[in-house]
């Protein structure tokens, strides 16, 4: 009985670890899809940061500016998941974004069940 319980607990831990890794992956992809493309023009990133392409008061772009930090974060995601990110920019990008969003929700659901037991 103890061995069976140990194996189940070990298996559950493996499922938890793998689900956590998948959740992180799909979170990154969904997050990056909600930002301008990495190669988007500066105007798109300005609009993302300020809500307009021609802000009246532009914050100084420094090493810690929102635009620069977001672009660096997207670049890391591009490097980590190049094929998945390319799918988001492709002809079927909306499909892939929807898939990634659904996968993120599913892995969050699995993790919630494991953590709460419900």
Sequence positions of predicted segments:
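Short, charge/polar-rich alpha-helical segments
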Residues: 2-71
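Generic N-terminal initiation segments characterized by hydrophobic and/or small/turn-forming residues
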Residues: 4, 9, 66, 85, ...
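Generic structural signal for well-ordered, non-membrane alpha-helices
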Residues: 21-28, 83, 105, 109
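Acidic, low-complexity, intrinsically disordered interaction modules
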Residues: 55-101
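Amphipathic alpha-helical binding modules
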Residues: 91-118
């Amino acid at each position: 009985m103890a061995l069976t319980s140990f194996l189940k607990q070990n298996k559950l831990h493996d499922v938890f670890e793998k689900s956590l890794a998948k959740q992180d992956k799909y979170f990154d992809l969904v997050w990056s899809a909600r930002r301008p493309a990495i190669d988007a023009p500066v105007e798109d990133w300005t609009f993302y940061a300020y809500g307009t392409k021609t802000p009246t008061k532009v914050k100084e772009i420094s090493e810690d500016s929102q635009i620069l930090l977001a672009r660096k974060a997207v670049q890391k995601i591009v490097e980590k998941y190049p094929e998945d990110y390319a799918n988001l920019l492709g002809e079927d990008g909306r499909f892939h974004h929807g898939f990634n969003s659904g996968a993120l929700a599913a892995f969050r659901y699995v993790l919630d069940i494991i953590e709460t037991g419900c």
